[in-house]
Regions:
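Intein-associated homing endonuclease modules of the LAGLIDADG/DOD-type, together
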Residues: 1-175, 207-251
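C-terminal edge-of-domain segments
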Residues: 179-186
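Long beta-strand-rich cores associated with HINT superfamily self-processing modules
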Residues: 5, 171, 187-209
Length: 251
């Protein structure tokens, strides 16, 4: 009827995994991916926010520096954080003007997170949301954004493993990198920070969070292709970062 979307695809509900162990605390990993410095591994947050979640970081605080116009920013360095990141993240090298070579971590969600337990995946997401996430005050909708498309698509996949449907919207910032913003609603609490958690609306309508609507079908032409065989009772499989449910239709 008009522009109404009336074709629905099933949505993955909490991906069942092997509960793989993670080489570091998943919440701290999420916090680093959000507000961590890729060379020094220091993490910068507002001081009041640190006071709210500091007990959730299981590593020993080595140094803290208070900065900012109103002394509102806290930069913290934790013992052992670099060594744990070495086990999970890829890296390149930064060459200083003096020729000194320093390891520079690449911010990506490691594959082991997707195979971790539900709680570990949720804790990693909470770290990302406490640092880079926001809440629409009027609607209570969650948002999170990055200037790196790889980290953005990684986050979409992480959300999908938790049964959360999200949308990705790129926005070109004048004189800066393109910003990729994801929006989603969920019944899950995705924040540890009190000021954000209190704003989240956790009773969205089921039709918004439990359904994926098919909005467009494009003809791709005729050509040779390989037959895909799926060995499970339902002949189903998951496609892309959003883990869209697809089924084998040709036997």
């Amino acid at each position: 009827r008009g522009n109404r979307k009336n074709h629905i695809l099933p949505l993955v509900q909490n991906l069942t995994t092997l509960n793989q162990e993670i080489a570091m605390d998943p919440y701290t990993l999420g916090v680093f991916l959000g507000d961590g410095a890729v060379i020094s591994t220091r993490i910068i947050m507002e001081t009041l926010d640190w006071n709210n979640i500091q007990n959730l970081i299981p590593y020993r605080l080595v140094k803290e520096t208070i900065t900012g116009k109103n002394m509102h920013l806290s930069t913290r360095r934790y013992q052992g954080l670099r060594e744990h990141l070495n086990l999970l993240l890829d890296y390149t090298y930064h060459i200083s003007p003096s020729g000194r070579r320093t390891k520079k971590f690449i911010k990506r969600i490691p594959n082991s997170i997707y195979m971790a337990s539900f709680q570990d995946r949720l804790n990693c997401l909470k770290g990302l949301m406490d640092t880079d996430g926001t809440v629409d005050k009027r609607r209570g909708r969650c948002e999170v954004g990055f200037s790196d498309i790889d980290l953005a698509t990684d986050t979409i996949k992480l959300l999908s493993t938790l049964g959360i449907k999200s949308s990705l919207r790129p926005k070109q910032i004048k004189g800066a990198k393109t910003h990729y913003r994801m929006q989603f609603n969920t019944h899950l609490s995705v924040f540890n920070l009190d000021r954000k958690r209190e704003l989240q609306h956790r009773s969205p309508k089921p039709e918004y969070v439990n359904r994926r609507y098919l909005s467009k079908i494009d003809e791709v032409g005729v050509g040779f292709c390989k037959k895909l065989t799926v060995q499970n009772d339902e002949a189903g499989y998951l496609v892309g970062h959003s883990l869209t449910v697809a089924k084998q239709t040709i036997t």
